[in-house]
Amino acid sequence: MNIKFRLILMNFMQFFIWGAWLLTIGAYWFQNKGWSGAQFGAIFSTMGISAIFMPALTGIIADRFINAEKLYGILHILGALTLSSLPLVKDPTTFFWVILLNMIFYMPTLSLSITVAYAALKGSNKDVVIDYPPIRIWGTIGFIAALWVVSLSHNETSVNQFYIASAVALALGIYSFTLPKCPPLLSKVSNKSFVNLLGLNAFALFKIPKFAIFFAFSLLLGAALQLTNAYGDTFIHDFKNVPAYQDLIAVKYPAIIMSISQVSETLFILAIPFFLRKFGIKYVMLFSMLAWVLRFGLFAFSNPAGGLWMIILSCIVYGMAFDFFNISGSLFVETQTTPEIRGSAQGLFMMMVNGFGALFGSFTSGVIIDKFFTMADHTKNWQGIWLCFAAYALVIAIIFPFVFRYKHNAALEHAIQHA
């Protein structure tokens, strides 16, 4: 079977698992179980908590003790078991712990999938810059497909969403053992010091200025991603409280409107190779930050009637905001680290974006919104909220090019292919 097709299948299932429940778990929580909103807030914190330590830890394990594709498969099989047990849970506290356990198994597979894909492409003499983005696009397609499968089968409030995700996780776990081997590379290194053995040498990247700065901005951009995930859908839902808007299609079906963001992801992924070759990694990252400014700024002045075009354009811009940093960031890590620590380094990248970034964004935005943008009647000043978020992204975009000193060079493609 063609290696590209095999990696496409891997990416499709990787994100199908997440898409099968991530956007519909709220409907299950409130409409099926009738549990409280305060308790539900803790559910999304499990992603940040698990992303802080698990990707880096499993990256170290993959670099030192076990083939990355085997570890990837084991984690998905364990994730399938936890997902299939969720329908048995009868109280929100236990539900939190089971979801946390599932996230502990799932979050590291995001970085491991990159490690496995890059190794397989290089082993087949493929160019990562050219060949990986069209493969990764199928992950987003998988996410969208899962959302539509669950919705069209009327399982948005049903336990079946977890069974669907579990079945695909089990299939991916088994399939992973057939992927090209990605063995630990420490065995090729003669210096097996205590630091190398535990994988702590990957953390030494923080001593290198360009990496310290890169990881800091990874955290800040991770916070921006959390802001849009947490408040985008809620923002549109709140228009139902305005009589003039409550019967509009965008208000009745906000998830359909927001799904434009995922479609945009698939299109911007295809543009990444061109932008990387034309502008280099540094400016592609900068374009991502400017896109976040537009994402939030357009929301600030939009509405579901005459301003619907702004909501749609904001969703389109999201593709650039999300893809241009996440994909170019993983390529930066890939090209600037030695083979022995790449798995650990990819884990650190995911830890900063989905771990500390998610927690930072969730906590600070909650405090700011409650303190400055929540009215006495508990309604929210959404324009103020989005302008605040846009200002945050703008400050990041202004500072970044002055402190991140990384120059694009013509040898980038060669370094990626032969590193």
Language-model regions, residue ranges each:
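Multi-pass alpha-helical transporter architecture, strongest
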Residues: 6, 85-89, 169-181, 385-419
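Hydrophobic core of transmembrane alpha-helices in multi-pass small-molecule transporters
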Residues: 12, 82, 92-112, 116, ...
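Cytoplasmic membrane-interface "Motif A"-like loop-to-helix N-cap segments
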Residues: 63-76, 277-289
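C-terminal ends and interior cores of transmembrane alpha-helices
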Residues: 77-91, 290-304
